[in-house]
Amino acid sequence: MGAALGTGTRLAPWPGRACGALPRWTPTAPAQGCHSKPGPARPVPLKKRGYDVTRNPHLNKGMAFTLEERLQLGIHGLIPPCFLSQDVQLLRIMRYYERQQSDLDKYIILMTLQDRNEKLFYRVLTSDVEKFMPIVYTPTVGLACQHYGLTFRRPRGLFITIHDKGHLATMLNSWPEDNIKAVVVTDGERILGLGDLGCYGMGIPVGKLALYTACGGVNPQQCLPVLLDVGTNNEELLRDPLYIGLKHQRVHGKAYDDLLDEFMQAVTDKFGINCLIQFEDFANANAFRLLNKYRNKYCMFNDDIQGTASVAVAGILAALRITNNKLSNHVFVFQGAGEAAMGIAHLLVMALEKEGVPKAEATRKIWMVDSKGLIVKGRSHLNHEKEMFAQDHPEVNSLEEVVRLVKPTAIIGPRDFCQWKSF
């Protein structure tokens, strides 16, 4: 696992809290109706006034500002006179939300709300996380990324290009918040199961960090979404006049690695060694390589490899406890051999070793099927990760035949790789 998970390095400690515990942020405001008498006035320690308040999503409360706050902040008359509590504003948003016919329209409503009233946005999300998570993140965020240029309203996050090498520290200094605790970064090359979306991949870091706040209580002003734009190999996007990223083929090799090296060091220099850097949706060729390169140097992890694996293996171990069974008694077949599958497989090997199973024997309990069939020794074009799980067996083309021959006790179909027709 990465430094954030495997070596004990965690987020920076806070006074009066255990090491790594972030203060829980809450968007909740007092519940008062339009004609309710607001509570006693409190000093408003802000330097911003007037439109700078109402147009700042971190400060804006919509019509929940009391009369005293409106007078102190110089916004009296800039918003309608009625006082609407956050509860009432939530009701209004929900009524409008439910009228939308498509999930993409619902996504746009929520993102627009996030851009103007952050407190209300997270109040909406936390009112029913199960309902809104599929809209803010998968699966709807994939559709939103595909239409990112068309639905683009306001920039959110930091856009770094391959041409910015040598200036990343300056760019990070342009970000208005200094106390960043979590960074989610992607280069847009493998967005969910949709392929190379280039700059449009920014929807992934934005959506993931919204869950950091809604589900984990991390202050949104301590979160930074980042898109590393090194070009795209998506010809459709390169021809699209609405595409807002770099319009050239992806840069690979030393120039790409130099950008990543500078980025990792610049983030650590700016925000500290305990700032968590989460990698999202990098292509397989880079994901494992960069994880192995940075995991013991920086506070980072790859969610597609390690995050998915930790949840999947935790579920397996929990099931074993219920059935009073041992992991070593099982044989696993994977449908798919991408980042998620490999991450789960590697963690299963670690769990088997913890039971006393030698590594060589542990790998023999894991059979992997990719788009070309069973991964076996001697098959051409196997990368390093696949070679580890290549079995000494004749080639088999279908999952059905693999199941018949191997007789597994468990079949695992990771997200984005599971072909349901195979089952």
Describe the role of every protein-language-model region.
Residues 2-8, 25-328, 334, 342-352, ...:
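Metallocofactor- and cofactor-centric catalytic cores in central/energy metabolism, strongly enriched
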Residues 339:
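Acidic/histidine-rich catalytic neighborhood
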